[in-house]
C-alpha cells in the first residue's frame, strides 16, 4: 500500500500523478519531505549582521571594482548591464593581520554536500562547495565560492546542519585574480539543469575537461538570493515553492515531446498539474534569466499543429526582454519570436537538443 502523500491538496494531486507507470521511476527521485509546505529555516551564510539588521546593501555586498555595491548583486549588474552575475558577493566582516578575510562561511540551510573543489585553479569559482537541500521543495542547491580553505572532513555525501561551518572566506579563483581587498563569498541559490550535462558539455567541444561533474557552474541556474531572503524575511513567501510560484514570466513556450526531462523528475514542485496518461509535450514558463519555473504537461489535443522537438514560443514579454540585456531569451525573426542564445542553451540541456 502506498502511504498518503504529504503537502497541500494541489501538491498531493501533482504527486499522485507520479504513481502512474510513467511516473513511478521518477517518484523514486522525490526528495524526502519534498511535500512539506511550511516556513523553511534559512540563515545568512556569513557572520556579518548587516543584512539581518536590515542595513543597506553597501554594508554587506562587495562591489566588483566599480565601487557600486549593486555590482555585487544578482543579474545584469556589470559592464553597463550586459554582464550576468549568477549570485551575490558578500564582503568580509573581519580580516587578519595580513589583510586576509577571516570570516567563517556557514551552510545557509541543512543539506547534503554534493561537490567540494579544493583546487583554486580548476574553476572561476576558485575553491567552492555545493550543497543540495532535499528537505525543501524544490530541492535547491546552494553554492559557496572563492573560499580560502574548505572545512576539514567536508566531502561529497556529508550531511550538514544549518549554520555548520563550510570553510573560510577568501579570494581564490581560476583564470583571473580577485584582489585581496575585494575578497568575498560568492553565494548562489538555484537549480541544477540536467543529469545528462556531460553529454551536452562534450558536444560543445570546449577544449577543456569538466572537472566538476554535474556541479559545473554551466549546469547551474541561480535565483536572486537577496530577493528570496528579503521576501522570506518580510513573510511574503515562506519557502521556495511559494517563491517560484510568484515569479514573473518572461517567455512561455511549447515543446512537443513524449520525454519527461530529469529536471521535472527532480523538481516536481514546479509542475502546475498532474501528468496525463499519455504525455504529448510541455508548456514551459521561464523567468527573465531563462530559468524554467513552471511546467505544464500537454495532451495530444493541446499540441495539434506544432512540430515535434521544435520549441514554439507562444508568449514573450518584449519589454522585459529589452530591459534585461544580460540575457537573450527571444529573438524576432521574420515576424516570429524564436529562441535566443540563452534560451537555446537551456533547451539543449533540458531536452538534449543539438
Label the predicted regions.
Residues 10-22:
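Bacterial N-terminal signal peptides that target proteins for export
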Residues 108, 154-160:
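Short, well-ordered loop/turn sites that connect or cap secondary structure elements
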Residues 92-94, 135, 149, 187, ...:
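Non-catalytic surface loops within mature trypsin-like serine protease
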Residues 100-102, 108-151, 180, 184:
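Zn2+-dependent peptidoglycan hydrolase active-site motif and core
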Residues 123, 128-131, 158-236:
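Conserved, short, structured surface segments that act as functional micro-motifs
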Residues 36-127, 211-354:
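Surface-exposed, glycine-biased beta-strand/turn segments
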Amino acid at each position: 500500500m502506498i502511504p498518503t502523500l504529504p503537502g497541500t491538496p494541489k501538491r498531493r494531486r501533482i504527486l499522485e500523478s507520479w504513481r502512474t507507470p510513467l511516473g513511478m521511476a521518477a517518484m523514486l527521485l522525490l526528495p524526502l519531505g519534498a511535500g512539506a509546505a511550511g516556513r523553511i529555516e534559512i540563515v545568512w551564510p556569513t557572520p556579518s549582521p548587516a543584512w539581518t539588521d536590515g542595513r543597506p546593501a553597501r554594508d554587506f555586498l562587495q562591489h566588483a571594482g566599480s565601487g557600486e555595491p549593486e555590482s555585487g548583486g544578482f543579474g545584469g549588474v556589470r559592464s553597463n548591464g550586459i554582464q550576468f552575475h549568477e549570485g551575490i558577493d558578500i564582503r568580509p566582516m573581519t580580516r587578519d593581520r595580513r589583510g586576509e578575510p577571516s570570516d567563517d562561511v556557514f551552510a545557509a540551510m541543512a543539506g547534503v554536500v554534493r561537490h567540494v573543489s579544493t583546487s583554486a585553479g580548476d574553476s572561476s569559482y576558485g575553491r567552492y562547495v555545493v550543497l543540495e537541500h532535499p528537505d525543501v521543495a524544490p530541492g535547491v542547491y546552494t553554492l559557496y565560492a572563492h573560499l580560502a580553505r574548505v572545512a576539514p572532513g567536508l566531502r561529497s555525501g556529508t550531511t550538514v546542519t544549518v549554520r555548520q561551518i563550510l570553510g573560510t572566506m577568501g579570494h581564490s579563483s581560476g583564470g583571473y585574480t580577485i584582489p585581496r581587498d575585494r575578497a568575498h563569498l560568492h553565494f548562489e541559490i538555484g537549480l541544477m539543469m540536467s543529469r545528462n550535462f556531460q553529454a551536452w558539455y562534450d558536444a560543445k567541444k570546449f577544449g577543456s575537461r569538466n572537472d566538476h561533474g554535474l556541479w559545473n557552474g554551466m549546469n547551474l541556474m541561480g535565483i536572486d538570493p537577496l530577493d528570496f531572503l528579503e521576501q522570506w524575511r518580510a513573510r511574503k513567501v515562506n519557502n521556495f515553492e511559494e517563491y517560484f510560484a510568484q515569479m514573473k514570466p518572461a517567455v512561455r513556450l511549447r515543446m512537443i515531446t513524449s520525454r519527461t526531462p530529469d529536471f521535472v523528475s527532480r523538481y516536481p514542485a514546479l509542475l502546475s498539474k498532474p501528468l496525463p496518461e499519455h504525455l504529448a509535450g510541455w508548456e514551459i514558463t521561464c523567468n527573465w534569466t531563462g530559468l524554467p519555473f513552471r511546467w505544464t504537461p500537454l495532451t495530444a489535443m493541446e499540441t495539434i499543429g506544432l512540430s515535434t522537438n521544435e520549441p514554439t514560443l507562444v508568449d514573450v514579454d518584449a519589454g522585459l526582454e529589452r530591459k534585461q540585456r544580460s540575457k537573450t531569451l527571444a529573438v524576432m525573426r521574420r515576424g516570429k519570436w524564436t529562441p535566443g542564445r540563452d534560451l537555446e542553451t537551456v533547451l539543449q540541456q533540458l531536452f538534449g537538443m543539438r
